[in-house]
Amino acid sequence: MDITAKTFDGQGGRDEFQRKNIAEKAIKLLKSNIDISPMVIDGSWGTGKTEFCHKLINLMKQDDTHNIIYIDAFKADHVDEPLMTVLAEIIKILPEGPRRKAFINRVLPAVRYTLKTVAKAGVSHLLRQDFADVANDFDEVIQKTADDSIDKAAELILKDHVEAEKSLKTLQTALTAIASQDPIIIFIDELDRCRPNFAVDMLEIIKHTFDVEGVSFVLVTNTQQLRASINHCYGQAVDAQRYLDKFIKFRFELSPHSQRHMTNPVLAANAYFYQLIGEKGFLSSSLLSNTLLKKFIAKFIGHQGLSLREIETLVLHIEVVQVLSNSNRFIPDEYIGYSLLRLVGVMLVCFRPDILREIRKGVVDADLLGDFLGVKKLPYLEEGGREIPEVCEFIMASLTTDFNENKVNYAISEDQQKKWNSYMRYVSYMEEVPYRDRAVAQILETANIMAFE
């Protein structure tokens, strides 16, 4: 389905992350008299910002109160002129006829001036480079003509300044006239993926050129990356957040949770994992309903902070393993531990191939795997204790005989191994702590399937 046509409800609609109410609140603000432009919809890469943006736009279009424009800044940054990008989209919403022609005629001076300024900057840069190469030969000539050049330069700067102010005023007046009939809301997406110069120029253009009544902007971006773009352009000495604050009036972060009003909120990524697995249907329902597997998926996604895009990557690789193994790697065995170890192999391929490379060399680093799974050390099991270890602790315990680097926090004594064996059988994780190389073999064999070995 075309992402631009996606909706929260209706035929083909979906709201699996329960974000419609977020969109409704954003729309309420955009329609209010509060000056919140530019507003930022913030979120990490892969959290579903673009899909949410299109669903919000389609929801808002139902009331037909605003002219709504969507700009994919990443696709537009090759033009290298944000002003042209925005104006071109505004022109598109005007019907063919006198109104569109009049608007184009009124904004042309500003466009011409912008292009002329860019061209001058390019020529000036080339002249400075040429001059630097032969500067020593022209010292005397420059000294004689310096005063005349300064006078002429000052005159040109003043003329350019007057022309700029005049062109800008004309452009803003034309925009105000258009927006007075139907307010304009411009959604600019993917600003965080643009070249730093284009992203910063877009912010400047929005603030200094499009700050007119009836025209609002919504930036859909990752502000952390936007700050990096600012530092790229102006240096690390610049406080990027304070610089950004000059351009943004209101910001909200797209929640990573799909169920936000519960004591234990559910991560959207966790819900998305089961949605994709269910849609594709390559894992059995009995396996998916296993308590330890569900706990492991939730623990790993939360610990790693996986994005929706990363969930898609993970599910794709699990499906690849199932296809290449004739559905023989993830099956509802008597013991779930083997499937979990194989799942660790898939996760290493997706997110930490560096650890996998070391394992292939024969280096099984307990600290690295523990950090990957969120286990700092194995718990000491008390005699008669009722506290059942967590699922990731079971996985680390099953690998204990394979660890050969940094294993002090994961070593199990003979007495402790008996207790681990008892717990493993109790929860149907595994019959006992495996012999050497047996557990790590599950990881490697699964990873090798994806390497076509």
Per-range role (PLM):
Residues 285-408:
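Helix-rich C-lobe and terminal helical cap/extension of kinase-like folds
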Residues 103-131, 135, 251-331:
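Conserved AAA+ ATPase small/helical "lid" subdomain
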Residues 374-453:
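Charge-biased C-terminal accessory regions appended to nucleic-acid-, cytoskeletal NTPase
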Residues 1-72, 429-453:
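Walker A/P-loop-proximal flanking segment of P-loop NTPase domains
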Residues 1-11, 15, 23, 59, ...:
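The catalytic "switch" region of P-loop NTPases
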Residues 46, 75-79, 223-227, 257-261, ...:
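Conserved nucleotide-binding/hydrolysis micro-motifs of P-loop NTPases
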